[in-house]
């Protein structure tokens, strides 16, 4: 797993073109109207839809106010620095409503559930499930064959760049609504109980619980059976 350097991310955001993409439904005498070089217009007779940058389309609408009877603008961001990740080529199961920003790495057969938010520079290992409404912060790194329970927070760090993000090693199970704070490393095969707040490193193959989280026992067969990772859920 390759973690992006914080300064690389900062430079990426600084240098990126800030964008306000819009979708405009337009009606009127549209023949001959040029909505801009970077816009895509799908016009049929007196109605159409235009996709493009607001800074390019807005002056066109104003300049052609006498020809345009009405229009409706759909916009979901303003001066956005980071696009969403293009997931079409990723060999993973990604459900509707997951928000995954660009420069995120997702391993094969991972599962990203509805409402999950994964920030720039994060790494999701092969076969790992990110459950509903999980937040994985910038540069948060999660290993292979993990389960991150619904509503959990894997804290990320972009600034200050010297700070360390969370690292979750392979085969870890994190219960619902747990919080793993910045700089914590969760060891291989560990289990974090639901609702725990983890403020220090977790050794491999232990169970931690509470606020703040403390080791309550070593992993045993009973714990393994209760936290088994089912590969059937990860098959494509």
Swiss-Prot record:
Keywords of the record: Acyltransferase, Amino-acid biosynthesis, Diaminopimelate biosynthesis, Lysine biosynthesis, Repeat, Transferase
Enzyme Commission number(s) of this protein: 2.3.1.89
EC category: transferase
Catalytic activity: (S)-2,3,4,5-tetrahydrodipicolinate + acetyl-CoA + H2O = L-2-acetamido-6-oxoheptanedioate + CoA
SUPFAM superfamilies: Trimeric LpxA-like enzymes
GO BP annotations listed: diaminopimelate biosynthetic process; lysine biosynthetic process via diaminopimelate
Annotated metabolic or biological route of this protein: Amino-acid biosynthesis; L-lysine biosynthesis via DAP pathway; LL-2,6-diaminopimelate from (S)-tetrahydrodipicolinate (acetylase route): step 1/3
Source organism superkingdom: Bacteria
Molecular-function annotations in GO: tetrahydrodipicolinate N-acetyltransferase activity
One Pfam family from the record: Hexapep
Described function: Catalyzes the transfer of an acetyl group from acetyl-CoA to tetrahydrodipicolinate.
PANTHER family linked: 2,3,4,5-TETRAHYDROPYRIDINE-2,6-DICARBOXYLATE N-ACETYLTRANSFERASE, ACETYLTRANSFERASE
Stated family: Belongs to the transferase hexapeptide repeat family. DapH subfamily.
The name this protein goes by in its record: 2,3,4,5-tetrahydropyridine-2,6-dicarboxylate N-acetyltransferase
